Design a protein with these regions (language model features):
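C-terminal motif of bacterial Sec signal peptides marking the signal peptidase cleavage site
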Residues: 16-19
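Extended ligand-binding regions for polar small-molecule ligands
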Residues: 21-23, 67-76, 142, 153-156, ...
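Ligand-binding clefts/hinges and TM-proximal coupling segments of bilobed small-molecule sensing domains
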Residues: 22-34, 156-174, 213-215, 244-267
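Extracytoplasmic small-molecule ligand-binding "clamshell" domains
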Residues: 29-106
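Periplasmic-binding protein-like
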Residues: 48, 125-132, 198, 202-243, ...
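Ligand-binding cleft/hinge of the Venus flytrap
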Residues: 56, 70-79, 157-176, 205-209
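Acidic, polar ligand-binding/catalytic clefts
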Residues: 71, 80-143, 213, 218
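A ligand-binding cleft/hinge motif common to bilobed small-molecule-binding domains
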Residues: 107-115, 162-163, 185-188, 192-221
């Protein structure tokens, strides 16, 4: 009788432990899927100092045009967007390693990057421009002769500057982790000019009136796209479908108007 009781106790204990194990396994699956009702979580790598595409507001919330676009696209895909601030210099490494699912933050489409990353169709135009202070003696690109110029490290600003004849005459080119640091050094006089995305400086010229000015001419005409890991055509297809739907239903236009005052999204 005692042996029977003990055997039954072991049987019950085994079932309980098995049930706990199953629940633990289910929990791991739900962590991978996350989101409401088991929807997938998409991890998006961003530069959180790249206004107005993705940056921190005065309450430290991550906001911006790309943030809103990515959030809406994830919803259209039945997923939730999780934003992961990354070192922009290592963005392709973060993507290829699987630590992020997408690069989405004013990410310029280039031939070099297309060898490493899958891209969506372009969704926004941009130019690489030269920026100085309003009272600077640098009035034209040719005036950069003998000057010190700042760029964001491993951004498309560097190659754009290198493609221009003035590159050989510039005294120093200083690289920065982000555009905020470069513009800060410009304001303090450690730089004579900064090369950066026109969409970025347009924002700062609005929020800091009377400080910066753009020189005439563009060093490079660019297009932004969303980067997807090579080999993940399935995710690329779903994302592009979501973006196309947003263009058709007016979501993209609404987000663009909120951030730029007009619909600038490419179709």
């Amino acid at each position: 009788m005692k042996k029977t009781t003990i055997a039954l106790l072991f049987a019950v204990l085994f079932l309980v432990l098995t049930g706990c194990s199953d629940k633990s396994s289910d929990g791991e699956k739900s962590t991978a899927d996350t989101g409401k009702e088991g929807t997938k979580e998409i991890i998006i790598g961003v530069d959180d100092k790249f206004a107005p595409m993705g940056f921190r507001d005065d309450k430290n919330n991550l906001v911006g045009f790309d943030i809103d676009m990515a959030t809406a696209a994830a919803e259209h895909m039945g997923a939730t967007a999780k934003f992961q601030p990354i070192d922009w210099k290592t963005k392709e490494t973060e993507l290829s390693s699987g630590r992020i699912d997408l690069i989405w933050n004013g990410y310029t489409i280039t031939k070099e990057r297309q060898e490493k990353v899958l891209f969506t169709k372009p969704y926004l135009d941009n130019n690489q421009v030269v920026v100085t202070l309003v009272d600077s003696d640098v009035k034209a690109i040719e005036d950069l002769d003998g000057k010190t110029v700042g760029v964001q490290a491993l951004s498309s600003a560097g190659p754009a500057l290198e493609s221009h004849p003035i590159h050989e005459k510039i005294k120093n080119i200083t690289e920065f982790a982000d555009n905020v640091l470069a513009l800060t050094d410009l304001k303090t006089g450690r730089l004579d000019a900064v090369v950066l995305d026109e969409v970025v400086i347009d924002y700062y010229m609005t929020t800091e009136e009377g400080v910066f000015t753009k020189l005439d001419g563009s060093l490079a005409v660019e297009e932004y796209g969303v980067g997807v890991k090579k080999g993940n055509e399935k995710l690329l297809e779903k994302l592009q479908k979501a973006l196309d739907t947003m263009n058709e239903d007016g979501t993209s236009a609404e987000i663009s108007t909120e951030w730029f005052g007009e619909d600038k999204v490419l179709r």
